[in-house]
């Protein structure tokens, strides 16, 4: 399979990703917060998940904290790991879940840690897939 075909496949898998992220502060004010995905669908974000995030994020950071929380799945030497590149997202996960494995400024999670986060943030987090073409 050539790189162009593989890139198109990954893009198709990630079509659920948001067209544009929204701030925690903005979404907390809404009765029924939603995010529009690249595929055109509107996805409802559960209010209780936003409130859970707000409990672990400094209120001054709410306008800068973007929803959804992006969990980037990568394959490293045959092992799948999750990267959290956004610094505010990483700090939130550290406070809320106790995961603190930061390498080169990126929070790194193992697959067995993902379900704990996804159970609590079913609608407010999104897993994206990345592949290294090296």
Curated annotation (Swiss-Prot):
It comes from the Archaea. Transmembrane segments: none annotated. InterPro entries: UPF0216. NCBIfam families: PRK04115.1. Belongs to the UPF0216 family. This is UPF0216 protein AF_0460. It comes from Archaeoglobus fulgidus (strain ATCC 49558 / DSM 4304 / JCM 9628 / NBRC 100126 / VC-16). The lineage of its organism: Archaea, Methanobacteriati, Methanobacteriota, Archaeoglobi, Archaeoglobales.
